[in-house]
Amino acid sequence: MATVTYPSSEPTTLDPGNASSTWPLDTTLGNTSAGASLTGLAVSGILISLVYLVVCVVGLLGNSLVIYVVLRHTSSPSVTSVYILNLALADELFMLGLPFLAAQNALSYWPFGSLMCRLVMAVDGINQFTSIFCLTVMSVDRYLAVVHPTRSARWRTAPVARTVSAAVWVASAVVVLPVVVFSGVPRGMSTCHMQWPEPAAAWRTAFIIYTAALGFFGPLLVICLCYLLIVVKVRSTTRRVRAPSCQWVQAPACQRRRRSERRVTRMVVAVVALFVLCWMPFYLLNIVNVVCPLPEEPAFFGLYFLVVALPYANSCANPILYGFLSYRFKQGFRRILLRPSRRIRSQEPGSGPPEKTEEEEDEEEEERREEEERRMQRGQEMNGRLSQIAQAGTSGQQPRPCTGTAKEQQLLPQEATAGDKASTLSHL
């Protein structure tokens, strides 16, 4: 896994039978002792380090914007916003491992010590698994929202999403425990590696299968199943003439809600597809390297670099997807990035707000509808508590004095007094 390896661009004397990790370059690089080759490797190591640093800066800025938008410009975050916040936080922390990787590539050795090696690798592993687990939970949430919108309404709330997100972080920390135990800088070596006990080859193979199953293929199976069921549901719904839960009078509101759900689903699908595109080469190359060891020649350094760089590029590209596919994030980015120019334009004569597209109007309408639903839910909970108070007051045989507040007394049924009864009889 890319989060637990820090390959060097220089040849090493590492014995693959004693210390190995899941990155293919954690083996001896063969007989590449020519001066020209060593010079080329040193230059490529510096260039690769610069690329890593650029990706790190862009990723930190982009994910910081996402976190700021969710926390600052979202008064009542939705379920999807909670999961995106945790995904952005994982991507942000994932970016912090790039400077260490860049330093090892530029210096051709790990200068930070064994303890820092273990810490950095463990943190990267936690954030890698948190990313895929968050995407899996988001896909399950999309399945519930589209296939079971009514039954899942009580569970698809922001507090439940926060609890699930906390469980995701805990599960990721448990999964990477082998990294904490076996990572470090081997004796006589200057690179950060996984140090397996004997038989090292068996341990290494088991770890690759373990990380690939839990960190990619298992979650990918769940994600594909969720979207397969979503496609089946959408196709069956389009064949119906009328939606059973939507009357013709409410058709515009129902259509807006469906369009909003489709946009959210499209954004989640795009994020998942990008994750698969960036991570699948890495896991496939690791599995191929177990079955048939790959050549350890400088000619393959470009392939190895691409395989390790793609996962970091994925964390860097997620904020760009949010900006293109989500109106809420687009508006949040505009407020932050275009705030000075907006003040200047607002002072110009005849300047006005930009025209909104149909999708933007739908999303604003959906936000208002969600806020109204939350207010109605709070009102129903209050009425439920008041009805329980009323039932408790009328359950006893002896009438009890009313001790509720004035607002509660107005909502409780009032019994007619004797004067009211007399006046009613006189009218009869």
UniProtKB/Swiss-Prot annotation:
The modification Phosphothreonine is found at T357. It holds the Pfam family 7tm_1. Residues 1-20, 344-428 are annotated as: Disordered. It comes from the Eukaryota. SMART domains: 7TM_GPCR_Srsx (SM01381). Residues 72-81, 141-162, 233-266, 326-428 are cytoplasmic. Keywords: Cell membrane, Disulfide bond, G-protein coupled receptor, Glycoprotein, Membrane, Phosphoprotein, Receptor, Transducer, Transmembrane, Transmembrane helix. Phosphorylated. Phosphorylation increases upon somatostatin binding. In the brain, primarily observed in the forebrain. Moderate levels found throughout laminae 2-6 of the neocortex and allocortex, and high levels in lamina 2 of the piriform and entorhinal cortices. High levels also present in the cornu ammonis fields of the hippocampus. In the amygdala, highly expressed in the nucleus of the lateral olfactory tract with expression also detected in the rostral portions of the basal magnocellular and lateral nuclei. In the diencephalon, moderate levels observed in the ventromedial and arcuate nuclei of the hypothalamus. It is a multi-pass membrane protein. PROSITE patterns: G_PROTEIN_RECEP_F1_1, G_PROTEIN_RECEP_F1_2. Belongs to the G-protein coupled receptor 1 family. This is Somatostatin receptor type 3. It comes from Mus musculus (Mouse). The lineage of its organism: Eukaryota, Metazoa, Chordata, Craniata, Vertebrata.
